[in-house]
């Protein structure tokens, strides 16, 4: 207990490892020791500076691991963690705080590994897309996915911090999806000049820059719709055209909007599934009673080893802890 005193007591590995701030040193086979971890480690393994836990109330309370398969790391401050490229502070367990690595393609994130604040500018998905203006986090998307999303455009003005931005109120993106123009026509989806429509939400071509009035019938994204649907109502679909997935308005609903796969999965609260029998796709909640996982908040489809079909794997639960297998 006193480093300057060569004497001590003999203990088992269990007793040593169960003592706060101590670890077993087997480096000398016939002179094994139960040694004290170096501060600010409150637990360590192998050597005194290989921390497995840090002082949650100290100046460096976050355990930062550089190798996912190695349970040891170093203790760092919040400033040092957040200043490291691709890392974020995780305070979800108050007495076991961690400095964790962001999920690719995030190059910076906050809160959780998949809440990006910056994307790899040279990667396949370099644009940060936010769905809530007051939330600085979002997902990383490609130029194609951004420009294909209704109301969004790609902003390359900052080369190392590209964004997929939503057009301001009263504006619509151009057909290229690279900038926005004023557009007062409610039935217009794309404007290449101020108040000159280039593509109508009704599916009909514009005449002299204006869209024809909506009529009874299905929106251009629908393959089927409700009886009372109008051609400018994208949320009345009962089936979707190829490449789109029906997202029901409610869990029991039979109608909704037809989204692309990226639009469906962008915030990770939904996943895509082919509807058996007619090859029509569905955009389902992670907690869907039939095909999802009860209590799951965020998920993704993954093909697990030995399985031919993709499986829903949960990454965040609503009110429960996540199991290693990804089942809530």
Swiss-Prot record:
Q: Which UniProt keywords apply?
A: Repeat
Q: What else is known?
A: Cysteine-rich, antigenically variant surface protein.
Q: What is this protein called?
A: Surface antigen CRP170
Keyword hit for Repeat: yes
Highest taxon of the lineage? Eukaryota
Q: Where are the sequence repeats?
A: 38-102, 103-167
Keyword Lipid biosynthesis annotated = no
């Amino acid at each position: 207990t006193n480093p300057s005193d060569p004497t001590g007591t003999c203990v088992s590995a269990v007793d040593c490892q169960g003592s706060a701030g101590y670890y077993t040193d087997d480096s000398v086979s016939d002179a094994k020791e139960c040694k004290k971890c170096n501060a600010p480690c409150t637990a360590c393994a192998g050597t005194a500076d290989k921390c497995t836990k840090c002082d949650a109330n100290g100046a460096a309370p976050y355990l930062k691991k550089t190798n996912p398969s190695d349970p040891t790391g170093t203790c760092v401050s919040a400033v040092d963690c957040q200043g490291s490229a691709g890392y974020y502070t995780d305070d979800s367990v108050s007495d076991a705080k961690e400095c964790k690595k962001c999920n690719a393609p995030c190059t910076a994130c906050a809160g959780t590994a998949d809440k990006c604040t910056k994307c790899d500018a040279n990667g396949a998905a370099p644009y940060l897309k936010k769905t809530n203006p007051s939330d600085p986090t979002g997902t990383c998307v490609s130029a194609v996915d951004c420009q294909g999303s209704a109301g969004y455009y790609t902003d390359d003005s900052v080369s190392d911090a590209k964004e997929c931005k939503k057009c301001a109120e009263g504006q619509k993106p151009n057909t290229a999806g690279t900038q926005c123009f004023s557009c007062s026509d409610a039935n217009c989806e794309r404007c290449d000049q101020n108040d000159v429509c280039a593509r109508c939400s009704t599916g009909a071509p514009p005449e002299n820059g204006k869209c024809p009035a909506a009529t009874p019938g299905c929106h251009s994204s629908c393959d089927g719709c409700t009886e009372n649907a109008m051609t400018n109502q994208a949320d009345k679909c009962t089936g979707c055209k190829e490449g789109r997935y029906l997202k029901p308005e409610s869990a029991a609903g039979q109608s909704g909007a037809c989204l692309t796969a990226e639009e469906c999965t962008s915030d990770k609260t939904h996943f895509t599934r082919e509807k058996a029998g007619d090859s029509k796709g569905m955009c389902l909640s992670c907690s869907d009673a039939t095909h999802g996982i009860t209590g799951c908040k965020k998920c993704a489809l993954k093909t697990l080893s030995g399985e031919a079909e993709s499986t829903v794997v949960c990454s965040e639960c609503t009110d429960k802890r996540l199991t290693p297998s990804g089942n809530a």
